[in-house]
Each structure stands twice: as C-alpha cells, then as structure tokens.
Curated annotation (Swiss-Prot):
The gene is mldr. It comes from Drosophila melanogaster (Fruit fly). This is Mitochondrial ribonuclease P catalytic subunit. Residues 1-22 form a transit peptide. Gene3D superfamilies: 3.40.50.11980, Tetratricopeptide repeat domain. Disruption phenotype: RNAi-mediated knockdown is pupal lethal, with the majority of pupae undergoing pupation but then most fail to enclose into adults. Larvae also display reduced levels of ATP. Conditional RNAi-mediated knockdown in different tissues, produce various phenotypes that result from adherent, dysfunctional mitochondria. RNAi-mediated knockdown in skeletal muscle is pupal lethal; pupation rates are normal but pupae fail to enclose. Also reduces sarcomere size, and affects myofibril organization and structure. Cardiac-specific RNAi-mediated knockdown results in adult wing defects. CDD domains: PIN_PRORP (cd18718). The keyword tRNA-binding does not apply. Its cofactor is Mg(2+). It catalyses: Endonucleolytic cleavage of RNA, removing 5'-extranucleotides from tRNA precursor.
Length: 544
C-alpha cells in the first residue's frame, strides 16, 4: 500500500502544486471531469497502475488533494475525474473500489460518477467476457439511474447504453429507447450509435436490419461509424459464410453511398477474412497509378462524371433548395438574386466561374488591395490563355482595388459584384450549373452546407459534380506564377468496376473526416467470387 506521505508527494495540495503539474497553467482550462493529459498520465502511472484497490485513507487523500489543488475540480465533479483516470479495461476493480469507498462514507455516487463506472465496465467487456456478477452490477446501476430520473440527459443516456451493451441476453435493447430520448435534445453521439449497432451485429441472433438502420441514421447525420461496428459484422461473417456475399455487398455499398473511408484496422480484418474464405473472397492491398489505374487488377477506377439526367436533376433542384433558401435572402435580397439571374441569362455560358474574393484571400489576408486584385487578374489570365470564357464573382468593395488589375479583369471576363453582405457561393454554383455540364468553377470552399441542403439523394451527385469541376489555388510563387490544383477525374470512394471493388482506407478512424478531394494513398482491391461449394461454419476466434 502507498503511504499518505507518498500520496502527498504525487498529488498537488493547495499552495504547493507539483512543479511538473504546474506546467502550462496559462493554457486553456480543462473542462470539469477531466485533467490535462500530462497530469492525468502522471496520476495514472504513479498511483493507479498495477493497483486493484486503495485504502479508504488513500482515496480520501487523492480526493482532497485534487479538490484543493485545482480550481476546476470541486466536490461535485471530483468523483468523475477520478473514475476518468481509472478508465482502462484492467482498472475495473480499482474503479469499483472507489465507488465502494464513496458508499462506505455515506456518499451517494451521482449520475456522472456512475456513468463513468459504466464506461469502465464497457472497456473491460471489450477485452474479456464479463462475469454474471459484473453484468448484474451493470444492470443494477442502469436501473437505479433510470429509476431516479424520468428523463436522462444525453450524456447519461450514452453511459447507460454503454453499460447495457456489455451484458448478455436482451437487456441491450433497452438502449434503443434511450437513443430516441437523446434525440429530444441533441443528435445522438457516434459512440451511442456505434455501441448499439455493434451489439446488433454481434449478438447470438443478429439484428441485422436494426444494425443497418442505425448505420444509415449515423451516416446521414454525418457521423461515421466507429471501427468496432464494421469489425463486429466481419467477425460475424467469418463464422456465417453463407451470408458473406450479401452482407459484404451491403457494407461496400454503404461505404460508397456515404463516401466513408474505413480504417486500417478494418482493412486488415477484411484481408484476414479473405484468407479464411478464399473460395468466396480475394482481397489485396494496392495503390493507384496514373489516371486512377489500380496496380493490382490493372483496371481504371470509375470516372467521377455524372450522367446528363443526374446533372439535370441537380440543376433544377439547386435553385429551389439552395439559391432561394431563407438564409440566403438574409444575406442578399430577392432583387439582387433576380438581377444576377438576368445577368447570367445575358452573358452565359462560361467555361469557368471564379470566386474572386476566395481567390484574392487564398494566399493570406494581410495583402494590400493592389496585391489582392493582381492575384485575381492572374487567375483570370490563367484561363484566358486557354481561350476560356470566364465569369468573376465579387463584392462591391472590390471596385476600390487596383484600377489597373481590375481593368484587366473587366476586359477579359464577365464581372458581377454583389452586395458586401451577400453570400458568394450560391451565386457561384448557380452560374456554373446554368452554364452546362462542361463548366468548371474556381474556389477553395468545400461547399459542405450546400451539399447538405440538397438532401440525401442529391448530395452524392453534387459531390461527384463538384469533384469533377472544382479548381483551386494552391499557392503563388515569388515570381508571381500560380500553382493550380486541378480536379481528380476518377472516383475517390469505394465503388465497383466490373466484378471488382476498390475500397480506400485511412491509417486510423476519425470522427471528423475531411471533405476535401484528396486521393487516398491506400486501397483494397476486392473480388467476391461465386460460391461453388457449400458454405461451412468456420470456427474462428471473435475479436470484440
């Protein structure tokens, strides 16, 4: 056991904070319930590692030192802070020891503390099977939280869901109403969705329809599922090969529909699955050569271009769903929109539509008006030298920029200046779409909100059109030359070419993937074969 003198050396007390823990005190104050990473790691390594329990006196000293030593830690949140430090899968006994300590001194653990304890149970569940006693403890905590609060806040709902999915039987399905409860005040988190979808795939009798519904809800809300969901499905298919072709096809189509990159963990599991059932699946890692040629199967990836019918639908819906949306008129007027549409009818079609302000400020905002105007003129010259017809969109204040540079723009391009308060993007996209399917546009803006407002059916069509037609400025050299990023003409998400799927993957999962059109470095080349022998039930070790 640690003695109290050693504990006082490890933990700062009021007026005598440990020098190492005082580092970076000027930085942003941590949120309640958390500790800065360096101090958290020291507390974990110096005190909690390899310990399964602490004495009451030790817990008292830990608690007092944290409350006295940190302004953001108080008697209300200190318990959650401590359980946040004891959160590793092998620290369940230590976390339970602290909760028992609280109860022994007559303190009732609050919802945040019990929620943190449920997350530790869940971490242990992903490392080893939980005992019946541990599962009973989880259910008791969940029942007590729900009995005390008719409506749980979103954080408590998420914690209870993580507890319920760590149990066997049907109790995990009690998490579904909690997911609906979260929707009352917020969008359910990636963690809550993923926990339930993973469980739906991995239970003895899979709830596949439910799992896919949850995945669709997540992706539609721009919340990419965690790796564990895909791994649960792949582990299931390793044991039930009869379902592999249909379910794997659903997975690949899902990744394509929502332009999701899986992580390397999932890619490795797909390769392992392929080696387990070579009669059904052939998977290789690959990379792309010039013009999107797969270096494994030698096929070219599918062109990103959309069909004439898809372009027609996109053009017709854009005006209604984006250009005349209420928040556009908050930054513009119906009169200005009408004036712009009349201008486009008179001067279109264009080969390229340029966002003048976006170009001007793309190499930095601390430029003189003369430098800003000169950069816009340089981009116009880039396209005029290719004999392109150009439209430049800007704001009224650009009239005050360098007369020489703006004169060049005016003489070599159509120029439309909106009110200084207007949004440029809707005007830019309208003019580009109105000019036809061959017209490009020049902007660094990723157009996320516009894609979102087009809806789930048109969003992927818009994204493909955007990828094919968007140019942007990379930089301007010291000699004044510009380096332009040209569009990638092949698809960048999972898709099928003939009998082969090409699936991009990234190094690790991120809940906030970029929307940029960068070519992924890593790909899988997957061929699903027609089944020629009866499916067998393969005995494999399931990875949680």
């Amino acid at each position: 056991m640690y003695n109290l003198r050693l504990l006082r050396n490890l933990l700062p007390i009021a007026g005598h904070a440990h020098p190492r823990w005082l580092a970076s005190q000027h930085k942003r104050r941590p949120q309640p319930g958390s500790l800065p990473a360096d101090r958290l790691d020291q507390l974990r390594s110096d005190l909690f590692e390899r310990r399964h329990e602490l004495s009451g006196a030790e817990w008292t000293e830990v608690r007092r030192s944290l409350v006295d030593g940190y302004k953001h830690i108080n008697g209300h949140n200190v318990d959650a802070v401590i359980l946040g430090v004891c959160s590793a899968p092998n620290q369940l006994s230590l976390a339970k020891s602290y909760v028992e300590f609280l109860r022994s001194r007559g303190s009732k653990p609050n919802a945040a503390t019990l929620g943190r304890l449920l997350r530790v149970y869940n971490a242990a569940y992903h490392e080893r099977p939980l005992s019946e006693a541990e599962q009973s403890e989880i259910l008791q905590i969940c029942r007590s939280l729900q009995a005390e609060h008719e409506t749980l806040d979103a954080s408590s709902c998420e914690n209870v869901i993580h507890g319920l999915v760590a149990t066997s039987g049907d109790d995990w399905q009690r998490g579904l109403p909690l997911l609906e409860m979260m929707k009352v005040t917020s969008t359910p988190s990636v963690a809550a969705y993923s926990a339930l979808a993973e469980k739906a795939f991995s239970v003895a009798t899979p709830e596949q329809e439910l799992a896919w519904r949850l995945l669709e809800e997540m992706a539609t809300a721009r919340k990419p599922p965690k790796c564990e969901v895909y791994l649960a499905l792949l582990n299931r298919l390793a044991n039930e090969t009869a379902q592999l072709p249909a379910q794997l096809s659903l997975l690949l189509q899902f990744l394509e529909r929502h332009e999701i990159l899986v992580s390397q963990r999932v890619a490795i599991r797909l390769q392992e699955l392929s080696s387990q059932v070579p009669q059904l699946l052939h998977t290789r890692t690959t990379h792309l050569g010039g013009l999107g040629k797969c270096q494994s199967c030698q096929q070219h990836l599918q062109p990103v271009a959309i069909s004439d019918e898809e372009f027609r639908q996109l053009s017709e819906c854009f005006l209604e769903r984006v250009l005349i949306r209420r928040d556009v008129f908050q930054r513009s007027t119906p009169e200005e929109v009408a004036r712009f549409k009349k201008f486009v009818e008179k001067t279109a079609p264009y080969d390229c539509v340029i966002d003048g302000l976006n170009v001007a400020y793309s190499t930095g905002t601390k430029k003189t008006p003369q430098q800003l105007a000169k950069l816009v003129a340089t981009v116009v010259r880039h396209f005029r030298e290719q004999d392109k017809r150009v439209l430049v969109l800007g704001r009224e204040h650009m009239r005050n920029w360098s007369k020489q540079a703006m004169h060049y723009v005016h003489c070599n391009a159509s120029l439309f200046l909106t009110s200084n308060l207007s949004h440029d993007d809707p005007f830019l996209l309208y003019a580009t779409l109105r000019s036809g399917q061959e017209t490009d546009f020049f902007s660094r803006d990723l157009m996320r909100s516009h894609a979102f407002h087009l809806g789930t059916e048109l969003k992927p069509i818009f994204r493909r059109w955007q990828q094919e037609h968007q140019f942007s400025l990379v930089t301007q050299t010291q000699t004044g030359q510009i380096i332009v990023k040209e569009p990638v003409r092949h698809r960048l998400c999972a898709h099928q070419v003939a009998d082969t799927w090409h699936v991009p993957y990234c190094a690790q999962y991120t809940p906030h993937p970029t929307d940029s059109f960068e070519v992924p470095a890593n790909w899988l080349c997957i061929q699903m074969k027609e089944q020629t022998i009866p499916a067998t039930k393969t005995k494999t070790k399931t990875t949680r």
